[in-house]
Regions:
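Multi-pass alpha-helical transmembrane bundles in non-GPCR membrane proteins
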Residues: 1-135
């Protein structure tokens, strides 16, 4: 696998050089702004602090992806989002629903096949294009 191969998935891409998706790059600031706001508003809530760090990591990883648009950058973008989703799912089950650690982990594990099956089903809808991975 060529980790530095250019990726061209978005209509905004203007060239294969750095910062060739300026609008996508700019929208990543929203993640960083949300992370800072969340950090200061939830000073005593550890779960919110964890999620705010993860929001910032999504902003940074996505900015790298939309700046360089190479395989390595896409991987860290996807991984940062996946870690956030699983962490949020776990924390929501623990804090909102009051589930045990065991049950929260089981739900996280069950999320994998459900997500895989639903994503494969959505691949049949051609109009969704590369956006299927985000649904």
């Amino acid at each position: 696998m060529d980790w530095f191969a250019p990726i061209d998935m978005y209509c905004e891409r203007t060239h294969h050089g750095i910062i060739s998706e300026p609008i996508n790059l700019a929208t990543n600031m929203g993640f960083l702004i949300a992370a800072v706001i969340m950090w200061y508003r939830a000073q005593t809530i550890k779960a919110c602090r964890i999620l705010s760090i993860m929001l910032a990591s999504i902003g940074i990883a996505s900015a790298l992806h939309h700046s360089f648009a190479q395989t390595w950058a896409a991987l860290i973008d996807v991984l940062s989002i996946a870690v956030f989703v699983f962490t949020y799912l776990f924390l929501a089950n623990r804090n909102f629903l009051g589930l045990s650690v065991k049950h929260s982990i089981i739900i996280m594990i069950l999320f994998l096949p459900i997500n895989f099956i639903s994503s494969n089903y959505l691949l049949d809808f051609d109009f969704l294009g590369d956006s299927v991975g985000y649904i």
